[in-house]
Amino acid sequence: MTLPASPPRYAVIGNPIAHSRSPQIHAMFSAQTGRPLRYERLLAPVDGFLPTVQAFRESGGLGLNVTVPFKLEAYALAEARLSERARLAGAVNTLSWRDGAWHGCNTDGVGLVNDLLRLGVALAGARVLLVGAGGAARGVLQPLAAAGCARIHIVNRTAARAAELAAAWRAAAPRTGTQVSAGALAQAAEPGGWDVAINATASGLQDAAPDLPGGLYAPDALAYDMMYGARPTAFMRQAEADGAARCADGLGMLVGQAAESFHIWHGVRPDPGPVLLALRTELLAAG
C-alpha cells in the first residue's frame, strides 16, 4: 500500500509572527486553485534566521515568505539568485527552493501596484507622492516605475534619507522614463496636486499621520496607506480632510503580494478578490 504524499511545505518566517495572516491567505488560495499545501508560521530568534531556514529546508520546506526583521538577511541568503525586483528593492520577502539553492524575490511592490489597479487608478502617467524612505518605500519604486508613473516624489521626515533613496534608485534602476525626486515632508506639495499619495511609513502603528502640508491632492486623487485595520488609518483621515477623493488601506496590498508569492511557487495565479473580501469582512466584524 502506497502512503499518500505529504503536501508541499511552505511558511512565513519572522519575529514576531503570531499575528501573521499569511497561513489563512495561502489556505484560501490553496482551496481556490486546488493546489494542496502545508503553510505555517515560523518564529525565528532575532539572531537565528539562517539556522531556522536550514532546519525548515531539511524538513522538506520549499518556500518562505519573509517578514520583519529578516528581509535583509533573506536578501543576503539569495544574493547570487535574485530577481530584478529584489535587487532593486534591496530586500527579499519570498524565498523559493529551486535547483538546489534559495532564490529570492520581492513581491511587495507588485502587490501594491495590483491593488492600485484594482482600485481603478490609472498609473500610466501618474504623479505619485511616496511618503517614507525606508524598506517599504524602496520596495515599491521599481513596480511603480514599471507601471508607467511619470513622477515619483519621495518625502521623509529626514530629508537626507529621501535624497539617498532617490539617488540610489537613479544609480541602480534601468531607464524607465519615471522622474524620481526627493525632499522633506514640508516639500510634499505639487502644483495641481498628486494623483496618488502612498504612506510607506509605520506612523499608523501609533495612530498618527506624517506631518504633511495641506493641498496635496489632485481631483479624483487616491490616498493609500500601506498599513491596514478595521477603521481608516490616521493618514487616511488626514487625506480625506485635505480633499483626497478616495482613500484605501493596505489590506489589498497584503493579499496581492501573497498572490504573487503563490504564483512564483505554484505557477498558477489565484484571484485575490474573494480572499480580500473575506479578510475585510473579518476585520470589520472584529473591529
Swiss-Prot record:
Its EC number is 1.1.1.25. It is an enzyme of class 1 (oxidoreductase). Keywords: Amino-acid biosynthesis, Aromatic amino acid biosynthesis, NADP, Oxidoreductase. NADP(+) binds at E84, G132, A133, G134, G135, A136, N156, R157, T158, A159, A160, R161, M226, G250. Pathway: Metabolic intermediate biosynthesis; chorismate biosynthesis; chorismate from D-erythrose 4-phosphate and phosphoenolpyruvate: step 4/7. GO terms for molecular function: NADP binding; shikimate 3-dehydrogenase (NADP+) activity. One of its GO terms (cellular component) is cytosol. The keyword Amino-acid biosynthesis applies. The active site is at K71. InterPro entries: Aminoacid_DH-like_N_sf, NAD(P)-bd_dom_sf, SDH_C, Shikimate_DH, Shikimate_DH-bd_N, Shikimate_DH_fam, Shikm_DH/Glu-tRNA_Rdtase. It catalyses: shikimate + NADP(+) = 3-dehydroshikimate + NADPH + H(+). Shikimate binds at S20, R21, S22, T67, N93, D108, Y228. Pfam families: SDH_C, Shikimate_DH, Shikimate_dh_N. One of its GO terms (biological process) is shikimate metabolic process. CDD domains: NAD_bind_Shikimate_DH. Involved in the biosynthesis of the chorismate, which leads to the biosynthesis of aromatic amino acids. Catalyzes the reversible NADPH linked reduction of 3-dehydroshikimate (DHSA) to yield shikimate (SA). PANTHER family: BIFUNCTIONAL 3-DEHYDROQUINATE DEHYDRATASE_SHIKIMATE DEHYDROGENASE, CHLOROPLASTIC, SHIKIMATE DEHYDROGENASE. Belongs to the shikimate dehydrogenase family. Homodimer. This is Shikimate dehydrogenase (NADP(+)). The lineage of its organism: Bacteria, Pseudomonadati, Pseudomonadota, Betaproteobacteria, Burkholderiales.
